[in-house]
């Protein structure tokens, strides 16, 4: 439960109305009930500003009310951004309360962990693993030998982290993600079989990284697969062995980066993108969804298509593709006309 | 074990031969052994009708035997559909028997569950969660705070359901699926970092939904990500935050629906389809495998390609694409011929 | 810990220097420390041959040293392949040591397992399941009724194997893979709903198969989904019901094979490939990443594109696609020129 005053303080906002009004949750403006907080940002919803039953409403500082309203008002620079922070307030409060160790937890001999950790039931932590302060490990997680996890990191149920991997501070790893599974490396043999190339590197996840549900990150053959600080990976993403993902790069769901490719900083990859192995992708590269990248990409380029091309060029080519049958018809008709013209010229030259 | 009579009753069929013949399982017609039931639907297998060792055979009502056969016969309108029901008989019998609570189950204080539930070992059920009647929860499942699960729903091993999600009745959720993980929402900051936008909505799965292994469904930012009744999702499908999937829509493996898109009723999406965010897909839309959808689609349209186009139009364009080098050659040759023609005309006009 | 002599014996190599030199691990040549072994294969790193602090160095037999070096040398035909084997030595030693049964393991009545098995905590093994010799089952694994697992197979944390599946010998199954989930089969009903077609077959994995993290393999409707010996599947691969994958075929991450398709032997599929259902793919077929296969493919063909075509043909078409706007311009200009030519001819014929 938070008061208007507390929330306004948190948001650097100002209260109009009763500062002691309290709320226990957030609602959409059109569904606001007493005890909830709502916000107004999208003009389409303006009418609800005057009818909402919410107890507190977030308004932009420059919004002029046409008449007085019932809820306590908190004025902020940007109500839309403000609501995110309010949600964070509630969420963090709830999570921060979870600490201690459930029954049925497998801990190693001489286990090293920081203060205020939570470890859920049926979680297995192998020998040599270490947790920082305020780490939350949900139930049914596997943390292999010598894994280290930084402060404040949250590991959701069913995550599996193989031996020797390093997880930074302030990370969030969603359910059933797998970190440190063997890279996909095999040496073809003369008889057609493949011999496994042992993968004895690890995965290093730096700070402030979020990893989506079901995402898989393979360990390096030797050395480290590296996910730099601030990277955000969506669900079901595949990061192969020896890959490096630069700082603050964002990768949407079901994208795959093949072995040994290096992705720069501050890139944005949409969903279902594929990057083949051994490439170098620059900084601030944008790749449209479903695109396939098979060549190095310089800094700042926007890519689209399969095979991927510079986005604007691909769009121009695709615009013609849409009408290819008409182009074919034009050419067929030209062929006929030119034959007639050639015939006529020949007739005349005879 | 079921008798021919029981099975015929179940299928609305009629028995020819001994009604008390019993079977304990189903076999392919070419592999039928005593004590099994087989069916004949594909003409390619007709010879086996006369040689199978199965004890019971399902035949279409209109199939005329060329000679008498050993197995007891059950005549039905459609043997192929009939076999599905018979399989169901056996399967349901087996599953329905599972009830009770294994040891090593984590249950909350004052846990509310219906009759005839099964809860497997190492499953964690958080406070406030409720199960309906005859719910089967396999081992190693995580059910978060305040989750509700409707009657007869089956949750296979390793499924993780985050707090506050709602699962309907008669649903099946396959192993390692994740429901309610955070939506992929971040606000870019001036310094290049991204700030997490808390995702405090939930996921609502209505009745009769099947969800494949490893599929991920993210919770909404505010409100609900919604999967309507009768929807069938295959394996490794990604449903992003705020998405809605309409009634009886079927989505094949590895397809991804990006944030806030609304998919209509009775659509059929093949595998590896991608739908970008904030779109509206109509009812009864069909999308071919691997297609990318980047625009709204009206009711009933068939889509194909990347970027996606109306299927028939895409096919015509692609037919020309297949022979683009020939088209290029035709044009090159025309360019030369026209140059010659122009030259000749000029010569003559001089 | 291994001596130079032991390692040389294992690699069929010869020692130059002290055969009793021992190492406890492997390092990159530029990071070699005493007690480690390094290798030299990439000419870019040649200078480190003369400066590395590693205790043992693997060199190609034909490499000529320019001056004497400190480490003990092991000469082999191919240092790069050699290092893989050395890594294997260390890895296998570590793993082979793991045996016995953790506490909190769910074992069935009259459980049958071979010698030297390891079973991790929170693993559930259902009735009728059997493990061969030296099987390693990590924590939090689910092994359903009557599943059999062959000798030396390693099953990583969180793997779920449904009832009745058969896993061969010397297999490796990575974390959170799912084997034997229901095939995606539904019969449309007159009212728009879908009725589940029970999937009562199983999955058969032969020997020497590796299965990546998060990969899903569905059970057959009737009969078996079959993964033949020597097959290697990367992460997040989807194998649908009734599929067969031939011997020694390698399939990279996020590829999906739809229902009932048969893939031949010794094929190589890159990442994010899609194969639609009911196809027959020959032996030794190569499919480039992201390609979509919608037709049968004969032995030995290389495929590329979406829809997939013979790779060389696709590349030629795509080369024209890149410059389609220029082609369109050429045609437009031809149309004009031909109109002028026609006009002129007409003028003259008048």
Protein language model annotation of sequence segments:
Chain A
Residues 1-103, 170, 176-177, 182-196, ...:
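Terminal amphipathic alpha-helical/low-complexity segments used for targeting or macromolecular assembly
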Residues 39, 100-310:
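Structural signal for interior beta-strand "rungs" in well-ordered beta-sheet cores
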């Amino acid at each position: 439960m938070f008061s208007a005053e507390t929330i306004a303080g948190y948001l650097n906002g100002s209260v109009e109305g009763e500062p002691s009004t309290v709320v226990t949750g957030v609602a959409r403006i059109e569904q606001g009930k007493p005890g909830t907080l709502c916000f107004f940002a999208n003009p389409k919803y303006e009418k609800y500003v005057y009818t909402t039953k919410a107890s507190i409403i977030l308004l932009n500082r420059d919004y002029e009310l046409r008449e007085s309203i019932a809820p306590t008002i908190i004025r902020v620079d940007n109500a839309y951004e403000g609501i995110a922070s309010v949600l964070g307030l509630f969420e963090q409060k709830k999570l921060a309360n979870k600490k201690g160790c459930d029954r049925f937890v497998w801990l190693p001999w001489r286990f090293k962990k920081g203060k205020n950790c939570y470890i859920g039931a049926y979680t297995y932590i192998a020998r040599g693993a270490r947790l920082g302060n305020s780490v939350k490990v949900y139930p049914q997680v596997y943390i292999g030998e010598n894994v280290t996890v930084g402060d404040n990191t949250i590991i959701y149920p069913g995550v599996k982290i193989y031996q020797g991997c390093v997880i930074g501070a302030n990370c969030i790893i969603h359910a059933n993600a797998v970190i440190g599974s063997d890279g996909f490396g095999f040496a073809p043999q003369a008889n057609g079989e493949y011999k496994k190339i042992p993968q004895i590197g690890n995965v290093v996840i730096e700070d402030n990284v979020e990893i989506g549900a079901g995402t898989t990150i393979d360990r390096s053959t030797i050395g480290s697969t590296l996910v730099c600080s601030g990277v955000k990976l969506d669900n079901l993403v595949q990061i192969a062995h020896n890959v490096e993902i630069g700082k603050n790069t964002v990768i949407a769901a079901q994208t795959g980066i093949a072995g040994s490719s290096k992705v720069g900083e501050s890139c944005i990859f949409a969903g279902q993108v594929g990057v083949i192995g051994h490439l170098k992708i620059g900084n601030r590269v944008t790749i449209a969804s479903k695109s396939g990248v098979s060549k190095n990409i310089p800094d700042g380029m926007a890519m689209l298509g399969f095979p991927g091309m510079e986005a604007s060029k691909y769009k121009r080519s695709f615009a013609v593709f849409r009408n290819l049958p008409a182009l074919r018809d034009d050419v067929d008709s030209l062929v006929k006309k030119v034959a007639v013209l050639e015939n006529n010229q020949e007739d005349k030259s005879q």
